[in-house]
Amino acid sequence: LVGTGFPYQKEQRKKLLPRLEAVLTGCQDVRRNGSAALDLCDVACGRLDAYYESVSPWDFVAGWVIAREAGARVGHLSEVPDGVPADLYPEQLLVTTPKVYDAMASLLKAADHA
């Protein structure tokens, strides 16, 4: 099960459709509850296997720390700019159970280039 969210700006949603299609065809299902922090806590406790999205730091940092401390693998699908702490960089987050991180990253990156 994979959690994600979508931008408030509708014009930004279309570019995310290839990722969503890849997840819907390559994973069990998608969940969206509207809270990045809660989605990350769901990864931390095992209700979700993965979460990906770009959000504001205040939307994800607490859940990121909880997930990381619970043993989740946390990272980004793109390079974090120099001088920006990875824990605060809000773009292209990927947080998963340790066993699925590489496969999920590959799936999402391949969708970006499809």
Model-derived regions, located:
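An extended, acidic
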Residues: L1-A114
